From Swiss-Prot:
Keywords: Antibiotic resistance, Cell inner membrane, Cell membrane, Cell shape, Cell wall biogenesis/degradation, Hydrolase, Membrane, Peptidoglycan synthesis, Transmembrane, Transmembrane helix. Bacitracin is thought to be involved in the inhibition of peptidoglycan synthesis by sequestering undecaprenyl diphosphate, thereby reducing the pool of lipid carrier available. It is an enzyme of class 3 (hydrolase). The keyword Ribonucleoprotein does not apply. This is Undecaprenyl-diphosphatase. Its EC number is 3.6.1.27. It is found in: Cell inner membrane. It is a multi-pass membrane protein. NCBIfam families: PRK00281.1-2 (NF001389), PRK00281.1-4 (NF001390), undec_PP_bacA (TIGR00753). GO terms for cellular component: plasma membrane. It comes from Rhodopseudomonas palustris (strain BisB18). The lineage of its organism: Bacteria, Pseudomonadati, Pseudomonadota, Alphaproteobacteria, Hyphomicrobiales.
């Protein structure tokens, strides 16, 4: 039991730290499962699905006041209505492709080799974008032009490849389309809510036969750790990238991906 609790804490930290950073939570969880020797058990696969809800609730908690104002204004405030429509438009491409090709992607791309290569390539792209002399024209995540929301949603589809990073794809897409760093990161958080809830419900339904109450304590620990860690990380992340950009996270990706490839090549 103690070893399972330790694994739950580690995976909860990995999920909470990486979910909203441009480093790929799915990729890190896959590597953690591989190198911590969790085995190919149905429980641990289900566990990594369930703890995502902790990270989702962290965003809802942090942005509750703003999201509540938007919800109240959905039927009377044009700005709130436009933002809600924008989020739905951005969510749509991933929902469609996920429904059509999600099974294929998980069957053929969810392996450590793909993750490591994706981490390295994504890190190189993040380094490149961070060095560009971009001139932002959008500084408010809730007021992007409607076509911009759609293009960001299309960029998010790249994150279906494990190791690419959902937040990384949406942040890079938003910045190239004119958003400043803070607005790009904030919209990535907002878009995470329907995207992650949709993925959570879909995966939960597909794996419903493996969900039992036998490991409820382990799941509760992972959930709580993910929630608390995500809150700390999101608050720190916005302040950091506003001042320093994404270079640290780009090198993080490259280093983790390279070390992963070396370990895989050595048969670890």
């Amino acid at each position: 039991m103690l070893s399972d609790i330790l694994r739950a804490v580690i995976l909860g930290i990995v999920e909470g730290v990486t979910e909203f950073l441009p480093v790929s939570s799915t990729g890190h969880l896959l590597l953690a499962e591989r190198f911590f020797d969790l085995g190919d058990t149905n429980f641990w696969k289900s566990f990594t699905i369930l703890i995502q809800l902790g990270a989702i609730l962290a965003i809802l908690a942090l942005y509750f006041a703003k999201l509540w104002r938007i919800a109240l204004g959905m039927f009377s405030d044009p700005a709130a209505q436009r933002f809600v429509i924008g989020v739905l438009v951005a969510f749509l491409p991933a929902a469609v492709i996920g429904a059509l090709a999600g099974g294929y992607i998980k069957s053929y791309l969810f392996n450590p080799w793909v993750v490591c290569f994706s981490l390295i390539v994504g890190g190189a792209i993040l380094l490149w974008v961070d060095q560009l002399d971009l001139q932002p024209t959008q500084d408010e995540a809730t007021a992007f032009p409607l076509p911009m929301y759609l293009y960001i949603g299309c960029a998010q589809c790249l994150a279906m490849i494990p190791g690419v990073s959902r937040s990384g794809a949406t942040i890079v897409g938003a910045m190239l389309l004119g958003a400043d760093k803070r607005a790009a990161a904030e919209f990535s958080f907002f878009l995470a809510i329907p995207t992650m809830v949709g993925a959570f419900v879909y995966d939960l339904y597909k794996n419903r036969a493996d969900m039992t109450m036998d490991h409820s304590l382990i799941v509760a620990i992972g959930f709580a750790v993910s929630f608390v860690t995500a809150i700390i990380v999101v608050k720190s992340f916005l302040a950091y990238v506003t001042r320093h950009g994404f270079t640290l996270f780009a090198w993080w990706r490259v280093i983790v991906g390279t070390l992963g490839l070396i370990a895989l090549a050595l048969g670890k």
